[in-house]
Amino acid sequence: DFVAVPEPAAPLSLLPTTASALRAWPLDAVSWVASGVVPTGVQQQLILVAALALAGVGTGLLVRHAGAAAAAAAAWVAIWSPYVTGRLLLGHGPTLLGYACLPWIVIVVRSSLRTRQRHLLLVVVAIPASLTPWGGVVAAVTAVLADLSRGDRTLARSAAVAAVASAWCLPWVLPAVLVGGVGADPDGPAAFALAGDSGLGTWFSALMGGGVWAAGAQPLSRSDPVALAASLGLLGCAVAAVLGL
């Protein structure tokens, strides 16, 4: 899906008018503006490299308190997983860029910076995710949940984080509201539903990082017993860590 043309055409209007256009907004506009300086082919390469680098480094930093070995393992899992592989095969570079922002968002929200500094830095690290509606929403949810996980959380501060997170979704929320009448494809939910690519059902497939709907984007390792056993073991470790076991 990650297709770029050498000379992208200017947007027909300031506001996208179809569901498909909204789905790629404001990424298309940013790509068009940047194409005057950075060729679209180079933009693609930068997005892919940045997505993997940011995901690995961010996840490693997120668990750095657990030691170098844990940080290295977390970074490896963040960039070498069924989820990342599936999105690369689908050509979902912008989606991976949003995914890569999540550990950085958690780091910033849980930092000891002053509120204003934290909010400003939060917007900065969330900008790549906000290039697509999916990335913006997931980044917003992550920011709020990260704030709620703080020991010194307050309702007012969580509300402030939610307000900041809502702001970076405005580039696509406002066009959707102002244009109006833009309906979603009724066949979309069925076409893009979770797939049980592990043989263990859709929920286990998703929890193990898989579940992509396109058979061509499902790694062959998803049907390998050894790989599945390793994935289940990793899932068990994650659950144990969350429960504090």
Which ranges hold each PLM region?
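Membrane-water interface of alpha-helical transmembrane segments
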Residues: 41, 45-48, 68, 129, ...
